Amino acid sequence: KDRWVRFFYLLSERIYQQAFRVTSLFTDARRIQIELGCAAEKCRVIPNGVQYERFCEIPLKPEDGWVDIGAVVRLAPIKDVKTLLYAFFELSARRERVRLHILGGVDDEDYARECYQLAEQLHLKHLRFPGRVDVAEYLKRLDFTVLTSISEGQPLSVLESMAARRPCVTTEVGCCRELLDGAPK
C-alpha cells in the first residue's frame, strides 16, 4: 500500500507541474490539491449542479402521521447501507411510525445480499428497497433524506434533496458539511 501511495504522490506532482488548470468539485478538494503540490493559481472549483427546476416545485409530503426517510444510494460497501440499517433499527425502537426507503440499484450483489439479510435479522418491517426510481418523482413521498457514505465527492443526492426543500442528514464526507453549512469564507 505504501508503494501505491508514494506512486500517487509522485504522479500527482508530475501532473500538477504539467497541468494548465486543475478543477475540483468543492473547496476542501481544492485545498488538498494545493497540499499535494498544485500551484494555487491553477486550481479552481466548479461544483456539481442539478436541474433546479426539476426539483424546486416538488410538493412537500402531506402529513399522514408517518415520517418517511429516503436514502438515494447504490447498494455498495462505500455507501455503508449497513450502518443505515442499524440506525433505522434504533430509530424504529424509539418511534413507531417511521419508514425507510432505500432508493438505488445494486452495485455489489454480495453486499446487497448482506444488507437484505441484515434487514431481515433486524426485523425491519417498515423498510422498502424500491430499487432504481425517478428520484424527483419519489421525493414527493419523503420527509427528509439521509446519506451514510464513508466516502463521497459532492453527492448529487444531497443537492437534489436540498433543491426539493428536503432536510438531509449526512456523514461528514466529501463536501457534505460545505453543502449543509455553506462554503468556508
Residues of each region from the PLM?
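Aromatic "clamp/platform" in nucleotide-sugar-dependent glycosyltransferases that forms part
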Residues: I150
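Short hydrophobic beta-strand element within catalytic cores of glycosyltransferases
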Residues: P167-T170
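Glycosyltransferase donor-sugar binding loop
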Residues: V50, V72, R99-R113
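Carbohydrate-associated surface elements
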Residues: D28, G49
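A conserved mid-protein helix/loop that constitutes part of the nucleotide-sugar donor-binding site
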Residues: A71, A76-E90, D110-R113
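A conserved, positively charged/aromatic
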Residues: K1-T23
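Short acidic/histidine- and often glycine-rich active-site loop of Leloir-type glycosyltransferases
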Residues: V173-K185
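Nucleotide-activated donor-binding/catalytic signature segment of Leloir-type glycosyltransferases, i.e.
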Residues: R113-R132
